[in-house]
Amino acid sequence: MSHLLIVEDDIAFGTMLQTWLRKKGFEVDKATSVGAAVKILSSSGSVDLVLSDLRLPDHDGLQLLSWMRKNDIYAPFIVMTNYAEVQNAVLAMKSGAADYIAKPVQPDILLQKINDATEGYAKSKNSNNATTDRKSKGGNAAANSRTANAKAADLESSTRQT
């Protein structure tokens, strides 16, 4: 069972996501701010995926992503953003986010993105079990960053065409 962390300041939406994802078989923690997310990540040891809003009351989701990477937490990071914030999603992808999803969230698309990201992360964790040095972790982060940058370029291209 994958362990997810939802970071969403809209309490009703975050609770709905948490309930729905638990019904889909995920273990789910929820935070309403970057500070609360940092506490969860610091105390839980690890998660398999972070699903975060970009705009949060204390900081933004990109600052959480940066904190995670500085603290050697390489779990996939999916950004949730409003349609009007597509350029912020591009920036998130360039910063190392695994993916993004526009609000309002379509459940089937969200579930597919979560499954894709957690399956990829599980495979990379298994391959890293043999080699746990920092250099290996950095290699995976670099590979994830290249994938995210390709998605960001596709996103930028599609926004220019519309």
Report each predicted region and the residues it spans.
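C-terminal output helix
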Residues: 85-87, 105-114
